[in-house]
A protein has these predicted regions:
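Flexible, low-complexity linker/loop segments at domain and module junctions
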Residues: 1-18, 103-108, 301-307, 337-338, ...
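ACP-dependent fatty acid/polyketide chain-elongation machinery
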Residues: 2-77, 99, 255-267, 362-376, ...
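Conserved catalytic cysteine-centered active-site region
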Residues: 3-13, 47-90, 96, 110, ...
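Condensing-enzyme catalytic core mediating Claisen C-C bond formation in acyl metabolism
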Residues: 15-19, 43-47, 224-301, 310, ...
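Short, well-ordered amphipathic alpha-helical segments that serve as non-catalytic structural scaffolds
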Residues: 88-99, 153, 180, 252-254, ...
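Phosphate/pyrophosphate-binding loops at sites that engage ATP/ADP/AMP, CoA/4′-phosphopantetheine
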Residues: 95-107, 257-264, 294-310, 332-336
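Glycine-/small-residue-rich "gating" segment that lines the acyl/pantetheine channel
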Residues: 134-141, 179-182, 186, 195, ...
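Acyl-CoA/ACP chain-elongation machinery
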Residues: 192-238, 271-285, 315-323, 339-389
Length: 428
C-alpha cells in the first residue's frame, strides 16, 4: 500500500464508470466537434471580440464562438444567467443526453451534481459594478448575486433535472474541475450517490480578468500571431492564452450503469491530490507537488508507473510551469517517462482555468475511445528542459489503456485523475 493516506484500496469501494460527456470549447461546441478540431490541430485563439482589447498588453484569447444562450435556456432566463452558468447548462445537457439518462427513470435522491469554477461570474460582477457606480445601488439587478456565485452552476443543473443528491461546487483555481470530479467519484465510491454530474465551467474573458493576468505577466503577448501564441514546451513560449467553456462528465457506479444499460465510455481508476505550500502562483521547485499528485493517483488506482500509456499534461505554455511538470513526470516515471506519450490540449483551446480539468478529462476519454492522441501544436523548437514526447504538431494513432489528466492551480493546488479502458471483469 502507498504511504500516502489518500490511497484507499484496502477499503471496499464501488467501481465508478464514465457514461456521458459534454463540452463547450473555443474550437467546437459539443464533444465530437471539439474532438475533431483537436485531432486536426486547430487553434481557437484570435483577437478578443467580446470587448476592445487595444489598451491591454495581451489582446488575444480563445473565445467560444457561435454559442446561442437560447439553446440552453429560454430568452428570459438566459438574460438572468452569467455566461459561465450558460456554458455549464449546455455541457451538462449534452453529457446527460449522451449518457442516456432519463431524469424521470432514475432516483433523483441518489443523483448529485458537483460543478466548479475557478473565478465564477466575473462578467456579471464587472457589469453590475459599472451599474452601481454609474446609476446607483437601486439599479443593481436582483439577480446579481445568484448570477455571480460559483455554486450556482451545480444548483441550476440539479433544479433542471431534479437531482437531489449531493450538490456543491469546488474552487481551486486551475485545479477546480479535477477536484470536482475527484469529489464526485468519492461520493459514489462510498455509496452516497449512484450518479453524479460533474466538471467545471468558466467565462473570464473580461476586461478586469485580462488586466489582472496581464499585470501578473502570465499571458502571451504574441498578438500578431494568435494561433501560434499558445505553445507549450516550446523554447519560444511566452505565457498562456486565456480560454473559456465547460467540460462535464457523467459518473455512475458500475452497478447503476449496468442496471440501466448505460453506454460505458471508460472506468475511473484513481485520483491524487496534493498541495505545494510554496508560492501564490509559482509551482514548487522541480514540480515536487505535481509529482506527489501523480504518484497518489497511480497508487489509488492500484497501478504502477509502467501501466500508464498517456498523460494529458497541464501544459500551460508558461516558462516555469512546463519545465516543472516535465521534471515531475521524470520524477514519477523514471526510465518509463520516455515511453509515455504526452500532449497539451491548451495548445489549441487556451487555458480554461476552472473548466480546464473537465474538458481535458474528456480529451483523455476520447483518446482511450479512439486510440488517437491529438497533437501539441506550435511545438516547433522544443525546449531542451522539456524533453518528453509531447506529440508535436501531428496526431498519432496508438492504443491507450490508462491515461492521466493533470491539473495544477494557483495557490499550489494539484490534482491528477486516472482513467482507463473499461473491462467487464476488471477492478482494482
Amino acid at each position: 500500500m502507498s504511504e500516502n493516506s489518500f490511497h484507499r484500496s484496502d477499503r471496499p469501494r464501488q467501481r465508478v464508470v464514465i457514461t456521458g460527456m459534454g463540452a463547450i470549447t473555443p474550437i467546437g461546441i459539443g464533444v465530437e466537434a471539439f474532438w475533431d478540431a483537436l485531432v486536426a490541430g486547430r487553434s481557437g485563439a484570435a483577437r478578443i471580440a467580446a470587448f476592445d482589447p487595444a489598451a491591454f498588453p495581451t489582446q488575444i484569447a480563445c473565445e467560444v464562438k457561435n454559442f446561442d444562450p437560447n439553446s440552453v435556456a429560454d430568452k428570459k432566463e438566459a438574460r438572468r444567467l452569467d455566461r459561465a452558468l450558460l456554458f455549464a447548462l449546455g455541457a451538462s445537457a449534452e453529457a446527460i443526453k449522451s449518457a442516456g439518462v432519463d431524469p424521470t427513470k432514475v432516483n433523483g435522491d441518489r443523483c448529485g451534481v458537483v460543478i466548479g469554477s475557478g473565478i465564477g461570474g466575473i462578467d456579471t460582477f464587472e457589469k453590475q459594478l459599472h451599474i452601481l457606480f454609474d446609476q446607483g445601488p437601486g439599479r443593481v439587478s436582483p439577480f446579481f448575486i445568484p448570477m455571480m456565485i460559483i455554486d450556482m452552476s451545480a444548483g441550476l443543473v440539479s433544479m433542471k433535472y431534479g437531482f437531489k443528491g449531493p450538490n456543491f461546487a469546488t474552487v481551486s483555481a486551475c485545479a477546480t474541475s479535477g477536484h470536482a470530479i475527484a469529489d464526485a467519484v468519492r461520493l459514489i465510491e462510498r455509496g452516497d450517490a449512484d450518479l453524479m454530474v460533474t466538471g467545471g465551467a468558466e467565462a473570464t474573458i473580461t476586461p478586469a480578468a485580462l488586466a489582472g493576468f496581464c499585470s501578473a505577466r502570465a499571458m502571451s503577448t504574441r498578438n500578431d500571431e494568435p494561433e501560434r501564441a499558445s505553445r507549450p514546451f516550446d523554447v519560444n513560449r511566452d505565457g498562456f492564452v486565456m480560454g473559456e467553456g465547460a467540460g462535464i462528465v457523467i459518473l455512475e457506479s458500475l452497478e447503476h450503469a449496468v442496471k440501466r444499460g448505460a453506454p460505458i465510455i471508460a472506468e475511473f481508476l484513481g485520483a491524487g491530490m496534493s498541495g505545494d505550500a510554496y508560492h501564490l502562483t509559482a509551482p514548487s521547485p522541480h514540480g515536487e507537488g505535481a509529482a506527489r499528485a501523480m504518484k497518489t493517483a497511480i497508487a489509488d488506482a492500484d497501478l504502477t508507473p509502467a501501466d500508464v500509456d498517456f498523460i494529458n499534461t497541464h501544459g500551460t505554455s508558461t516558462d516555469l510551469g512546463d519545465i516543472c511538470e516535465t521534471e515531475a513526470i521524470h520524477s514519477v516515471f523514471g526510465e518509463h517517462a520516455g515511453k509515455v506519450v504526452c500532449n497539451s490540449t491548451k495548445s489549441m483551446i487556451g487555458h480554461l482555468l476552472g473548466a480546464a480539468g473537465g474538458v481535458e478529462l474528456i480529451t483523455c476519454l476520447k483518446t482511450i475511445q479512439t486510440g488517437t492522441i491529438h497533437p501539441t501544436i506550435n511545438l516547433e523548437n522544443q525546449d531542451p528542459k522539456c524533453d518528453l514526447n509531447y506529440t508535436p504538431n501531428t496526431a498519432v494513432k496508438r492504443p491507450v489503456r490508462v491515461a492521466l489528466s493533470n491539473s495544477f492551480g494557483f495557490g499550489g493546488h494539484n490534482v491528477t485523475l486516472a482513467v482507463g479502458a473499461y473491462q467487464r471483469n476488471g477492478g482494482r
